[in-house]
Amino acid sequence: MRKSLKQKIVSSLLAVSLAVSLAPIGQAKADSTSEVTQTPSITKQIDPNRAIEHVRFLSETIGPRPGGTKSEEWASRYIGMQLKSMGYEVEYQPFQVPDQYVGFIESPLSTKRNWQAGAAPNALISTEAVTAPLIFVQGGTKLEDIPNEVNGKIVLFERGTTVTDYNKQVENAVSKGAKGVLLYSLIGGRGNYGQTFNPRLMKKQSIPVFGLAYAQGNAFKEEIAKKGTTILSLKARHESKLTSLNVIAKKKPKKSTGNEKAVVVSSHYDSVVGAPGANDNASGTGLVLELARAFQNVETDKEIRFITFGSEETGLLGSDYYVNSLSQKERDRILGVFNADMVATNYDKAKNLYAMTPDGSTNFVTDAALQAGKQLNNDLVLQGKFGSSDHVPFAEAGIPAALFIWMGVDSWNPLIYHIEKVYHTPQDNVLENISPERMRMALDVIGTGVYNSLQKPVPQTEQKAA
């Protein structure tokens, strides 16, 4: 870890630790079943305000956390130091991840849109700024769409609908003397607003070409409409030979033999380029850290692990690496994995907290979640079928696991679902996308499910497998 990064972590931790220590303790919810009434409910120890302070630090103080970058490393060290301060044994598990091509835009506009974008790998990648006025051009797939005024300017386009279309936009702008090209997405792949992307160019270009999110492009378009133009500076960086980290905290039973069953609470802490990732997935990481604090003094006869994975957004790389590092004996020790991803959105159509498995089957974790919902008199907890998160590698290895996510589902076949429109965008921030009430509910449900799992006897089938 570089010295400058370490200084940032230490100074920032002092500030956030003070804020967290002053947060009030949340009120407990009454148990509605008799299964655990003999012991205090873990919800008495849970405070969503603490979790949201972690969300705020990760998404605002650090910001976008693409896999393998310095910002992701900063986040991993922050998480590790928080867990160590609670008394946990902490391991950093490194693994290699693909290169990142990141564009940076200096703009007179507010920084709330996170002026970070995807850079085209085979366009100009340079830390020396390309500075020029910005001009918006409608269309651009035909040469006649491009006015002569683009000469010496940075051109903003609404991204063409296909790779071929946006390559034509770039090539036509270059032929008219453009100094840079910004392509902004209109829509994402899941009904969300357009997100940043790395343009795939068919020809090498000697100017910077960036892929912007809808919010960024629209903000620039509005600025041009108001003022006629604005001056931008473009820089880009190719980050190679990258290492990402899984942060693993363990709490062994008081009488440990090394063969006890284990319950895992997990999340990923990285985000996509250009997105502060408050809900996706600083929310899950804030939940993991708050549950780690709540469970630090809970005695059980099972091991509990709190794991935050790196580089989920680049293909579940962290969780896949972790699962592959386990022997079959170690895999058999895991009773279940409670994976939190996008657990605090305020989006009204994401109306249920789901416990999802990749194939839709029930397992130890979904059963625990549904039981917790009943115990808490919460009828918003449902079970369903969904992949696309860190529960998948565990499930593929035969380990019971479930994804916890706020979502609205209109139909399972065909699958028609709702997640927040600001998913994977610069608008995924605390102010615009985080609900303390939703965070509270996720903490209560997952916390209660984990608590019950740690207290109850190991199922007979699991005892035989051990």
Can you say where each PLM-predicted feature lies in the sequence?
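Sec-dependent signal peptide cleavage junction
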Residues: 20-35
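N-terminal capping segment at the start of a domain
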Residues: 33-71, 86, 93-95, 196, ...
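Second-shell loop/turn segments in exported
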Residues: 37-47, 60-73, 89, 121-125, ...
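Noncatalytic luminal/extracellular "stalk/propeptide" segments of secretory-pathway proteins
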Residues: 44-49, 53-154, 161
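Alpha-helical metal-binding/catalytic segments enriched in His/Glu/Asp
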Residues: 83, 173, 187, 247, ...
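Soluble metallo-hydrolase cores and metallopeptidase-like ectodomains found primarily
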Residues: 117-144, 198-278, 293, 297, ...
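Metal-dependent peptidase/peptidase-like ectodomains
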Residues: 300, 309-408, 412-413
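His/Asp/Glu-rich mid-to-C-terminal helical/loop segments that flank catalytic regions of hydrolases
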Residues: 413-466
